[in-house]
């Protein structure tokens, strides 16, 4: 189980990304459309003025059951350990153990 503070920090980051996504997307579109270097520099400073945690790459994929940050399968949102346990119990529909 991950520390509760780390999970809470990640939840806070997700909320901040959601709150600033429109503003960040508009600035990024303007940045890529601008041709003048000085205009790009000005837009870049505005982007830097946004909160750091509003960048989507700062959000960590975590297991929803345990909060572990590593070995998380995107399709299920579970870490590898929980995926294995739940697949053995039959709690994941459509998942079968492979054999050949």
From Swiss-Prot:
<dbReference type="GO" id="GO:0015935">
    <property type="term" value="C:small ribosomal subunit"/>
</dbReference>
<keyword id="KW-0689">Ribosomal protein</keyword>
<comment type="similarity">
    <text>Belongs to the universal ribosomal protein uS14 family.</text>
</comment>
<keyword id="KW-0699">rRNA-binding</keyword>
<dbReference type="InterPro" id="IPR001209">
    <property type="entry name" value="Ribosomal_uS14"/>
</dbReference>
<dbReference type="InterPro" id="IPR018271">
    <property type="entry name" value="Ribosomal_uS14_CS"/>
</dbReference>
<protein>
    <recommendedName>
        <fullName>Small ribosomal subunit protein uS14</fullName>
    </recommendedName>
</protein>
<comment type="function">
    <text>Binds 16S rRNA, required for the assembly of 30S particles and may also be responsible for determining the conformation of the 16S rRNA at the A site.</text>
</comment>
<comment type="subunit">
    <text>Part of the 30S ribosomal subunit. Contacts proteins S3 and S10.</text>
</comment>
<keyword id="KW-0687">Ribonucleoprotein</keyword>
<keyword id="KW-0694">RNA-binding</keyword>
<dbReference type="GO" id="GO:0003735">
    <property type="term" value="F:structural constituent of ribosome"/>
</dbReference>
<dbReference type="Pfam" id="PF00253">
    <property type="entry name" value="Ribosomal_S14"/>
</dbReference>
<dbReference type="InterPro" id="IPR023036">
    <property type="entry name" value="Ribosomal_uS14_bac/plastid"/>
</dbReference>
<dbReference type="GO" id="GO:0019843">
    <property type="term" value="F:rRNA binding"/>
</dbReference>
<dbReference type="GO" id="GO:0005737">
    <property type="term" value="C:cytoplasm"/>
</dbReference>
<dbReference type="GO" id="GO:0006412">
    <property type="term" value="P:translation"/>
</dbReference>
